[in-house]
Amino acid sequence: MIYNCNFTVDQSNRELTRHGTTAFPIACYLDDLSQAHVCWHWHEEWEAGVVMEGEAILSIGAQTCTVSAGNGFLVNSGVLHSYQAKGDARCRLHVLVFHPRLVGGSMESVFYQKYVLPIAENRSMEGFFFHKDIPWQADAMAHILHAFQTCEQEPPYYELHVRNALSDFLALLLTHTSGVQAKGNAKELRDTERVKQLLSF
C-alpha cells in the first residue's frame, strides 16, 4: 500500500507516525513536494527515496543538495532531514521508510551486527545522495524502486521480495561506502546536534 506524506512530530521533532507494522516495519510514500514541503523531522527508521519528477532540495543533517529526477537519497537512523521542491514545477518522490530490523532481523543476528550496525550507528554517515550516472548508485536506486513497486502491487510473497531488494540495496551501499564510513566530520556532527536542539525549543 502507498501512502501520502502526512505526519506529526513531538517537541524534539521526532516523527510520531508508525511506519508499517511490528511484523513488517516498512511504509511507502508518494511525496508531492509541489503541494507541501516536508518539514524538519527525524525517526529511527532508514529513509530511502528517488525523485521521480522535477527537482527537490533535500537537507539531510548538515548536507543540502538539489536532487533532480532519476536521482535518489538515503537518510540514516536518527538524522534530521527536510525536503522541498525547487521552484514552482511539480516535484514527486517515491520514498521508503523502513526499520533496519526489516533487513537485519534481531539485534543479535549476524545480519544486524555485521551489516546494519556499521551504517545505523555511524554518525559520520548522516545520509547519502545517489546519482543515476554512477552505475552502482543506479543499481541501488533500482532496488529502492523495486521494493516500492512490490509494496504497491503486493504480489504473492511480496514481503520476501521487498526484504530481498532492501538487502541487495544494503549490500551495494556497504560495498561502495567503506571510505565514507571511515571518515568523520566533527563540525558537521556538531552542527546537526545544534540544529536538533534549536528545533526542540
Regions found by a protein language model. Name each.
Residues 47-50, 139-143, 165, 172:
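Amphipathic, well-ordered alpha-helical segments in soluble domains
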Residues 67, 106, 156:
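Loop/helix-junction capping segments adjacent to catalytic residues or to phosphate/diphosphate-binding pockets
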Residues 1-72, 79, 113-114, 124-128:
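Generic protein-terminus/edge-of-domain signal
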Residues 126-137, 151-201:
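Short, Lys/Arg-enriched, Trp-marked, Pro/Gly-tolerant hinge/linker segments that flank
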Residues 2-25, 80, 84-148, 179:
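A hydrophobic/aromatic-rich effector-binding and dimerization subdomain
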Residues 38, 58, 105-106, 181:
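Short acidic, gly/pro-rich beta-turn/loop elements at beta-sheet edges
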